[in-house]
Every structure is written in C-alpha cells, then in structure tokens.
Amino acid sequence: MKTLLYKQLRLVCQPMTLVFCLFGVMLLIPAYPYTVMWFYVMLGLFFSFLNGREQKNVYYSALLPIRKRDTVKANCLFVGLIELLALVIAVPFALLRAKLGIGDNPVGLNANVTLFACGLMLFAVFNAVFLLSFYRTAYKVGVSFVKACIVMAVAAFIMEAVVHFPALSRFNGYDLACQLPLLAAGLVIWCGSWPLIFRGAAARYEKVDL
C-alpha cells in the first residue's frame, strides 16, 4: 500500500494540489468566507484525479498485480493525506491572524476552532459524494466533482450563515469549551466516514468493466 500511495504522490498528484494546500494564508484576509479555503483543497484534488485520468492511471493500475480495492484504498489515503496537510498548514495562519489582532470576520466564520471542525465535515461530505460518484465509472471526474461541489456549497453556506443566529453565535467566538467538542465531532465524522466511503467506492469499482 505504501508503494501505491507513493505512486499517487509521484505520478498522479498535480502540482496545483499542493499549492492549494497553502491557501490557509487566506485566513489573513480581514473579511472573507473562509470555507472557500477548503473548496480550493477540493479543487486541487479534482486536478489530481483529472491528471490521473489523462495519464491513464486507472488502466495502468489495472495492469498491476493488485486488487481493484487496493487502488481505491490508495486513492482514499491520498485524498485524506492532502486534506490533513491543508488543515495542518492552515493552523499557523489562524494563530498568526490572532497575533496580528485582525478583528472578527463580518461575512461568516471566524478563523477559529469551529472553522476547522467545519472543514473536516465539509471534507467528509465532499469525499462521500465525489469518490462514490467517481468510482461508478472511474472516468467521469468532472461530473463527480460538480455533484460534490453542489452539495459542499450548500453545506458551506449553511455553516457560514448559522453562526449569525444569536443562539449559535458562541460557536463563532474563541471559547474553546464550546468549540473543542465541535472539533471532536468533526474529527469523528471525518474519520468515521472513511471506512464507509472506501467500502462503497470499492464495491462500485469492482463492478466497473475496464
């Protein structure tokens, strides 16, 4: 599996995917819907999957002495690694924003723990829709991405909006007692979704006639 993941990183990973992981710097923008930062990470993943298709990675992998589900597992590990990398890189920028004394974000979520919890949840939503759709054919990258983006955009809009309701405004502050349980929930959702996504995607890919 390590070899397959290495193949994904060396042959499939599009350079812009790694560039978009650096977009945590957007947290230094004073007024901006910060969930867009997570969208760029997903866009980077789309570019890598598109690159894999154009490089005939699916057919190359099919020629290797491995099971189809191993290919799916390697892709899932690749996606998870990129998402974790983006989250980790964004943390120093959130801390720097606080150090610089930049005020609250008037257009949505602040650069706080809740934002990272929402990022994990959005990634889980994107992964479920995108990967399950993609592995129906292992070819239609664009259609799968559009489907995932529509669902993700609705979820992101709700997340950006609900914190403006007085009853939920505490989640948009900086009270860790309120936000750490939300982060834990996001982590559980993200981690817990992977076995389901993998099994579903692998089952669909097994039925694809290459």
Model region roles, listed by residue range:
Residues M1-V58, A74-L210:
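Hydrophobic alpha-helical transmembrane segments of membrane proteins
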Residues L63-K68:
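Short helix-to-coil transition segments within interhelical loops
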Residues D70-V72:
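Alpha-helix N-cap/helix-start motif at helix boundaries, enriched for small hydrophobics
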